[in-house]
């Protein structure tokens, strides 16, 4: 008598791995607070918290290319067609996008940082612009690197994306623990690089790996136009969402004391831990629905 094994739907596997990943990431973020306050002090950690608010803003640096590509991959899979040319085209466009935003950040970092971090001018003095620019670079690597995860989700192996994402945050936390227990003196910029740069670098390494595999694939003008046309709508939606959901950091940077900013940050981390249950299911179901 054959025993028929229960097949777990792929979206539940992805959702389950996403829950585990988000728990690890939220745990890292919450645990890092006490270490960062010990390393930097309350006022500098408040600055660190404001800079991490740029992470969501920098998620728009791919111009919606990742989400547009994810939909095309799902559509091609449903029709049993190759989507390699779409991936290569998207990676070319994302490279142009990141160059554009790096130039944009370099030009406007001085003006924006002077306003955004105006409450901490005495602490930062003339380091405001470079600190803001460095933060944008680190978080932009995460924004562009997210394209790698969009590809994996579209290929219905989102558990790999969740694994890589959780691993990258754990590496950042290990770096922070090394600094803390070694008693190494670091500033805000280096603390931010140690904790968040691995998050961007791991996903970017996967993008390089996929590009090398697709080096021989030929692309046409129609592939680029298709990606841009699909991505523009997602980019606009992302911008509107950011404006609505991230205005709070602009307000607290001007109105709250360092102690209040720290308290607000902790509260938002806890809220994010609860909110991930919904987002994990949505993230897992999206590519499946797109193939229907």
Where are these regions (language model features)?
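Signature of the first transmembrane helix
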Residues: 9-71, 98, 102-106, 138, ...
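Hydrophobic alpha-helical transmembrane segments
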Residues: 162-212, 268
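Alpha-helical transmembrane segments of multi-pass membrane proteins
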Residues: 119-145, 192-197, 201
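Helix-loop junctions and terminal segments of transmembrane helices
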Residues: 63-78, 154, 271-292
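Interhelical loop/hinge segments that connect adjacent transmembrane helices in multipass membrane
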Residues: 1-11, 126, 185-193, 204-245
């Amino acid at each position: 008598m054959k025993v028929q094994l229960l097949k777990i739907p792929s979206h539940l596997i992805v959702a389950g791995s996403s829950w585990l990943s988000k728990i690890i990431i939220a745990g890292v973020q919450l645990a890092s607070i006490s270490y960062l306050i010990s390393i930097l002090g309350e006022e500098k950690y408040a600055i660190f918290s404001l800079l991490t608010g740029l992470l969501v803003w920098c998620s728009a640096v791919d111009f919606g290319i990742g989400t547009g590509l994810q939909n095309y991959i799902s559509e091609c899979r449903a029709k049993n067609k190759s989507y390699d040319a779409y991936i290569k085209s998207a990676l070319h466009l994302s490279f142009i996008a990141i160059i554009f935003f790096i130039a944009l950040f370099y030009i406007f970092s001085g003006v924006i940082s002077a306003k955004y971090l105006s409450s901490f001018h005495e602490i930062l003095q003339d380091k405001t612009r470079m600190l803001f620019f460095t933060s944008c670079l680190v978080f932009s690597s995460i924004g562009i690197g997210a394209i790698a995860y969009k590809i994996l989700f579209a290929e219905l192996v989102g558990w790999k994306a969740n694994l890589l994402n959780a691993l990258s945050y754990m590496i950042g936390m290990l770096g922070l623990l090394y600094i803390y227990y070694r008693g190494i003196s670091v500033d805000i910029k280096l603390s931010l690089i140690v904790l968040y740069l691995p998050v961007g670098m791991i996903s970017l390494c996967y993008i390089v790996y996929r590009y090398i595999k697709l080096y021989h694939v030929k692309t046409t003008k129609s592939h680029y136009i298709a990606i841009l046309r699909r991505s523009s709508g997602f980019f606009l939606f992302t911008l509107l969402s950011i404006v609505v959901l991230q205005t709070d950091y602009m307000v607290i940077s001007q109105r709250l004391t360092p102690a209040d900013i720290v308290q607000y940050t902790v509260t938002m981390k806890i809220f994010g831990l609860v909110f991930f249950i919904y987002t994990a299911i949505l993230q897992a179901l999206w590519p499946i629905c797109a193939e229907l």
